[in-house]
A protein has these predicted regions:
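Detector for C-terminal structural segments
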Residues: 2-17, 22, 34-152
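Short beta-strand-to-loop elements that line the ligand-binding cleft
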Residues: 25-32
Length: 152
């Protein structure tokens, strides 16, 4: 749900900072997830909204492709021909270094255009015994026990 206590605390903190530092008065609106998604898809007027994404595969495209023209999750409405060209070239690149370079250029272009403002990043910490085998860090922070075992 988009109505979690953590999201509300972040929104209140940002609103307070904007009021104190910039003189910007905000009106906070808390929406259930289904309402939030429907409003974004219908492009209902909202000047700022909180969104989040966790990569479901280990590639920068998991984030960058969200802002491609035509992406159903491009709720910001961002559209930029050079960004599209860079994404397409990165998808077509067979060399990993070239692909990373192109994705880096696309990311810089996206951030320079300001359709998003990264506020924070989810992190996780695990204390793992050196004897534990099968524990692999991953973007979703999921660790099925069927893959875990202790070494002798």
């Amino acid at each position: 749900s988009n109505t979690s206590t953590v999201h509300r605390r972040v929104a209140l903190a940002v609103a307070a900072m904007w009021r104190e530092q910039l003189g910007v008065i905000t009106e906070l609106r808390n929406e259930e997830w289904k309402v939030f998604v429907a409003n974004r898809r219908q492009r209902r007027e909202t000047e700022v909204f909180r969104g989040g994404w966790i990569a479901d595969y280990d590639d920068a495209g998991s984030f960058l492709d969200l802002f491609a023209t035509g992406s159903p999750l491009n709720w910001s409405g961002f559209a930029d021909a050079e960004y599209e060209r860079l994404l397409g070239a990165a998808r077509a690149a067979s060399d990993p270094d070239e692909r990373a370079r192109l994705r880096g250029e696309a990311e810089a272009r996206l951030l320079d255009a300001h359709p998003i403002v990264p506020l924070y990043f989810y992190t996780s910490k695990h204390l793992v015994s050196p004897r534990l085998r099968g524990f692999e860090p991953n973007p979703l922070d999921r660790h099925p026990s069927r893959f875990l075992r202790f070494a002798e």
